């Protein structure tokens, strides 16, 4: 299957180019390292992929959501991913309430198997905004690492903790919505459980 770029032009498909894309999917997400994942189920990838699919279905109808993409360890063949990493491009003026609710459901599904999920946000200019906050209501907390807590509801702008490169924002490994776009060789479970289902007519 040809690999598609964000502009619809076929990219070179070679073992080296696929390896570089996989490396970029992790290297361009700069975050502090924590403990190794210890999921409570034998097939954590399946559980996370199903949770991501549900998130996409919910997020795609949120006014202001323009693109949903998948990145991180789920786009690799890593048997035990640490979490589900989703990138959502938004209209910078959108109300984040509905998207945050969908994000908390994704996080909750991941937490039930002792894993995590992050919903990263970018605007239409390719600027990284931060992550969806996992708290339902915004008020001062010692655990909150947002640089401007409360300035925008449901946005955790902890850019000193996590940053995404402009290249990753522009060309994430897999676009999930509004169109499925593969920029690397997709693991079989991602293809079967996620992409094939998302490509089915509504």
Predicted regions and their residues:
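Catalytic core of pol beta-like nucleotidyltransferases
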Residues: 14-67, 75-81, 90-202
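Aromatic/basic-lined ligand-recognition segments
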Residues: 87
